[in-house]
UniProtKB/Swiss-Prot annotation:
Keyword Plastid listed: yes
Protein family (similarity comment): Belongs to the universal ribosomal protein uS2 family.
Top-level taxonomic group: Eukaryota
Species, as recorded: Gracilaria tenuistipitata var. liui
Gene behind this protein: rps2
PANTHER family associated with the record: 30S RIBOSOMAL PROTEIN S2 PROKARYOTIC AND ORGANELLAR, SMALL RIBOSOMAL SUBUNIT PROTEIN US2M
SUPFAM superfamilies per UniProt: Ribosomal protein S2
Keyword field: Chloroplast, Plastid, Ribonucleoprotein, Ribosomal protein
Protein name: Small ribosomal subunit protein uS2c
BP GO annotations: translation
GO molecular function: structural constituent of ribosome
CDD domains: RPS2
Length: 231
């Protein structure tokens, strides 16, 4: 049984691709037709591939695997944080710092710094510092929160990464390929499916399309982890 209906996908605008002249020919198998110079994605395949992806994700979550959600563009940022938090996953929704995965030990030291500053803030220690020093600490805390808040509880590399907008998140995808971290990705018509482990062809620009797909993925993570707890 499909995890999503064609009418839900249509309503969310998941079928709208990019202008035909901007396409990646490798996406041809997932394109239904061209209309007014815009490629239309085959939603039958979207529903099938999303269902298969969610079954895989549920099984992985049941085994205790951890997921990192990534989407730094405006349309995705809110959904990414919301669904990652809901499913007890990690997320990056502001800026991908180069080496976030491939140079994890350095990034981890910044995460530990964030944790220390937050503890100092909660204990009121920052307020007790001289005015200038307190201001420096608060600026540092704000910057670290902005970039690292979604991974501050991540003690090791994630088992899987869920990506919105392959073209934008190239650096992260290259890091995952280098480290062998499987990539689950919403693929628009300008993307390359050959470098993605679990492709989900769909509109990666429309908020409703992003939310529909990412929330189904989060549901599957929750189902898997809940089943494991109640075993």
């Amino acid at each position: 049984m499909s995890i999503v209906s064609l009418s839900e996908l249509l309503e969310a605008g998941a079928h709208f691709g990019h202008q035909a002249r901007r396409w990646n020919p490798r996406m041809f198998p997932y394109i239904y037709t061209e209309r007014n110079g815009i490629h239309i994605i085959d939603l039958v395949q979207t529903a099938q591939l999303l269902t298969e992806a969610c079954q895989f994700i549920r099984d992985a979550s049941q085994e205790g695997k951890k997921f990192l959600f990534l989407g730094t563009k405006r349309q995705a940022a809110g959904v990414i944080a919301e669904q990652a938090i809901r499913s007890n996953s990690y997320y990056v929704n502001q800026r991908w710092l180069g080496g976030m995965l491939t140079n994890w030990m350095t990034i981890k030291s910044r995460v530990e710094r964030l944790q220390r500053l937050e503890m100092d803030e909660q204990a009121g220690l920052i307020d007790m510092l001289p005015k200038k020093e307190a201001a420096i600490n608060r600026r540092e805390l704000d910057k670290l929160r902005k970039n690292l808040n979604g991974i501050k509880n991540m003690s090791r590399l994630p088992d899987f990464i869920v990506v919105v907008d392959q073209k934008r998140e190239t650096t992260a995808i290259q890091e995952c390929i280098k480290l062998g971290i499987p990539i689950i990705c919403i693929l628009d018509t300008n993307c390359n499916p050959e470098i993605i482990d679990i492709p989900i062809p769909a509109n990666d620009d429309a908020i409703r399309s992003i939310k529909l797909i990412i929330s189904r993925i989060a549901d599957s993570i929750i189902e898997g982890s809940t089943y494991a707890l109640n075993k």
